[in-house]
């Protein structure tokens, strides 16, 4: 009998505290962007905070739909991965790893970046990342090998200063 009363009392207290926690205001939004050798500013904290406000206009902890918010942040083309979580103090934490371009590709008159995984993503209106320009009709299957070549050029001080781009013409690559 004592065990039953204890379990019921514990359940009541737990449900009361959970309701109180869900109705509490979100204290803070902490955004952690990945740090790299060359800073990346495709997405900034203001963009993410605006997105959080859209997903939680009431600012109540219980109204935050963390999986949906995380999915929406991951849909941003400049974001490689995002992790959204709430701690017990009512702070929403957002960890973001931005895509880092290996090269900028000009293909059929359109410009876009390609990251180390071979993923294409658009040019930003807010930020231009310093990377090698590649021109020509480059197939997506060639991105990995081309990325490795660009990385080798970037690591060599002489090559980095001497070559400013790569151009593909008639299935041949020419260093510019």
Identify the residue ranges that each predicted region occupies.
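Charged, solvent-exposed interaction patches on well-folded alpha/beta domains
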Residues: 1-75, 80-176
């Amino acid at each position: 009998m004592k065990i039953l009363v204890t379990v019921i009392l514990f359940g009541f207290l737990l449900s009361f505290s959970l309701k109180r926690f869900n109705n509490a205001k979100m204290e803070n939004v902490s955004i952690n962007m990945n740090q790299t050798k060359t800073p990346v500013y495709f997405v900034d904290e203001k963009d993410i905070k605006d997105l959080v406000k859209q997903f939680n206009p009431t600012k109540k902890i219980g109204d935050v739909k963390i999986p949906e918010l995380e999915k929406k942040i991951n849909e941003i083309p400049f974001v490689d991965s995002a992790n959204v979580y709430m701690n017990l103090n009512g702070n929403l934490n957002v960890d973001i790893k931005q895509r880092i371009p290996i090269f900028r590709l000009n293909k059929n008159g359109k410009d876009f970046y390609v990251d180390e995984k071979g993923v294409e993503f658009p040019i930003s209106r807010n930020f231009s990342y310093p990377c090698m320009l590649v021109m020509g009709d480059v197939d997506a299957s060639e991105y990995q090998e081309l990325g490795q070549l660009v990385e080798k050029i970037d690591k060599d001080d002489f090559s980095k200063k001497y070559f400013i781009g790569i151009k593909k013409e008639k299935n041949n690559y020419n260093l510019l």
